């Protein structure tokens, strides 16, 4: 981000575009960059990453979210045949569910208060449940709802000595954590996960660039198009944004076209 609220401000940080001028190995290539949204900008060549040839640019905008999801999965260390719940079916939660769903024999359930997210879960080949029907006795739970009620659901879904990985972003807000009841007697673990550093289990060997490259390669599955809404133009955005931001819009990732 650049600038100050309320204005002027350059917002956003995930950009996919074509290199108009630069080193020969990048010129004319489609690249991913962490940069505020705008139609043209100058960055060092080291700040961009070429997309795999098979990856559509529209899906590559999920790269930063996939990095967050991958880091959280490393922090949680799920295994084959584990029962896993993901509370919060936003873009990051859905990507965690997608990654866990590829583990042999794992029982993966995406949990959300919005019943429309069931269709996303279906397209990702994982189960769906409302919070009141969330699975119990889980080996591992990911909390990605950024709500106190979601964290409570995550803890309630744990089996004895299970782990909750919290990858929510609460900002400066404070939430209540239900550490009473059987939290201690059941020896539950609450682990924080944040994409700012590579997960400890990988940090000695993995750089951030290697992690980003892995995230881009993991986006090669076309099932992930279920998370992406059709693009709107930057010119139309002022009129479209109010509807996009409505809680009932069901939009997980809104593409914006600056061309």
Model-derived features: where do they sit?
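Local beta-strand N-terminus motif with an aromatic residue
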Residues: 81, 137-139, 224
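Mid-domain Rossmann-like dinucleotide-binding core that forms the NAD(H)/NADP(H) cofactor-binding site
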Residues: 59-131
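C-terminal hydrophobic helical "lid"/dimerization subdomain
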Residues: 206-259
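A structural motif shared across PLP-dependent enzymes of the aminotransferase-like
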Residues: 32-45
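Class I SAM-dependent transferase core
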Residues: 48-61
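Glycine-rich beta-strand-centered segment in the early N-terminal region that forms part
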Residues: 1-35
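C-terminal substrate-binding/catalytic core of Rossmann-like NAD(P)-dependent dehydrogenases/reductases
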Residues: 178-228
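Glycine-rich cofactor phosphate-binding loops and adjacent beta1-alpha1 units
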Residues: 119, 124-191
């Amino acid at each position: 981000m650049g600038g100050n609220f309320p204005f002027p401000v350059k917002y956003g940080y995930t950009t996919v575009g074509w290199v108009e001028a630069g080193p020969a190995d990048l010129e004319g290539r489609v690249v991913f960059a962490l940069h505020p949204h705008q139609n043209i900008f100058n960055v060092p060549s080291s700040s961009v990453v070429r997309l795999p040839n098979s990856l559509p640019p529209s899906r590559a905008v999920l790269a930063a979210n996939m990095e967050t999801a991958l880091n959280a999965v490393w922090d949680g260390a799920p295994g084959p045949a584990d029962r896993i719940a993901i509370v919060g079916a936003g873009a990051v939660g859905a990507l965690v569910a997608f990654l866990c769903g590829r583990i042999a024999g794992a029982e993966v359930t995406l949990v959300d208060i919005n019943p429309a997210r069931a269709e996303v879960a279906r397209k990702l080949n994982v189960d769906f449940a409302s919070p009141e029907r969330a699975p119990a006795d889980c080996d591992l739970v990911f909390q990605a709802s950024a709500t106190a009620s979601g964290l409570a659901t995550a803890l309630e879904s744990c089996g004895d000595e299970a782990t909750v990985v919290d990858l929510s972003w609460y900002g400066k807000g404070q939430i209540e954590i239900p550490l009473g009841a059987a939290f201690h007697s059941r020896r539950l673990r609450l682990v924080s996960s944040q994409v700012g550093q590579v997960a400890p289990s990988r940090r000695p060997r993995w750089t951030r660039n290697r992690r980003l490259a892995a995230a881009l390669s993991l986006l090669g599955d076309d099932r992930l198009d279920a998370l992406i809404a059709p693009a709107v133009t930057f010119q139309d955005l002022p009129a479209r944004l109010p509807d996009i931001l409505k809680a009932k819009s069901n939009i997980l990732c809104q593409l914006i076209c600056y061309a």
